[in-house]
Design a protein with these regions (language model features):
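Conserved small/polar residues in nucleotide/adenosyl-binding loops
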Residues: 1-3
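Glycine-rich tight-turn/loop motif centered on a GG-T
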Residues: 8-15, 220
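An alpha-helical appendage that flanks or caps ligand/catalytic pockets
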Residues: 15-50, 92-203
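Alpha-helix-loop-beta-strand connector modules within alpha/beta enzyme cores
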Residues: 20-24, 223-235
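N-terminal beta1-alpha1-beta2 module of alpha/beta enzyme domains
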Residues: 57-60, 225
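Hydrophobic faces of well-ordered beta-strands that scaffold small-molecule active sites
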Residues: 62-65, 80-85, 114-121, 206-208
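A conserved active-site cap/scaffold subdomain adjacent to cofactor or substrate pockets
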Residues: 68-89
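Glycine-rich, proline-tolerant flexible connector loops at the mouths of alpha/beta enzymes
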Residues: 86-91, 153, 207-222
Length: 235
């Protein structure tokens, strides 16, 4: 997020953040090999190395979050695994992200195909009432996610100014109905089918996005149902 980049780098726009990533990934690999001097636009440091050295050959796996085609291309070119998320969007976006990854693999066919992981908001419940409440909670999460990302509302003591019910109701793309449709929310059987869809597209790993506006016990129950009734459907 731009807020995080600004905080960590003392003010940096998303485009510059992408360039900084493209510079630091090769540098990290070189540091693992040892005696590397950083002389880049964003990173500069004298000859140094990592200690101890990693045991993996040629280096530990690196995961890069990607959305646009350039990010997929860069990750595959560098031999890095890719993590994608449709955010509040649905299966169409999940398919589109895999298409970008496949294009990147074709563009760099000389590189061994890396792994790809999809991160999706996931909620498992046993009753329709619980499922609908889960959709409402994830809707609320994204309303605040969008507000933080826009970086326009006042912040006091680390908390953003509360959104009104009217403001959240006006954010149709984050509506509970859309979250119920787009996010992986439902009974164990429904969730299995949604994850099978991702598996059939070619995703290697599925990441359960548990962060939401739900309370701890609700999250715990969902995760327990996922472990007990969803995971056995997969190897």
């Amino acid at each position: 997020m731009c807020i995080r980049d600004s905080r960590l780098a003392g003010g940096i726009d998303p485009f510059s953040a992408g360039n900084a990533l493209r510079e630091i990934v090769p540098a990290i690999k070189a540091l693992w090999r040892g005696d590397y001097t950083g002389e880049g636009e964003h990173w500069s440091f004298p000859k140094t190395t990592s200690s101890p050295k990693p045991q993996q050959t040629p280096n530990p796996p690196i995961w890069i979050a990607a959305r646009d085609q350039n990010s997929h291309d860069f990750a595959v070119k560098e031999g890095c695994n890719v993590q994608v998320t449709p955010l509040w969007l649905g299966d169409e976006e999940v398919s589109s992200l895999m298409e970008k990854f496949d294009i990147a693999c074709k563009n760099y066919s000389d590189i061994e195909r890396p792994k790809i992981m999809v991160l999706r908001h996931t909620f498992v419940a046993e009753t329709e009432e619980e499922i609908l409440q889960g959709a409402k909670d994830i809707s609320r999460f994204y309303c605040y996610f969008g507000a933080w990302f826009k970086n326009e509302r006042p912040i006091e003591q680390g908390l953003i100014e509360k959104l009104t019910d009217e403001e959240m109701a006006g954010l149709e793309m984050y509506s509970p109905e859309n979250m119920r449709k787009n996010s992986v929310i439902g009974s164990p059987e429904e969730v299995i089918a949604r994850i099978k869809f991702c598996e059939d597209l070619g995703y290697d790993e599925y990441s359960y996005w548990i962060d939401s506006s739900m309370d701890f016990e609700t999250k715990k129950k969902s995760l327990e149902l996922f472990i007990e009734k969803v995971m056995p459907a997969f190897n």
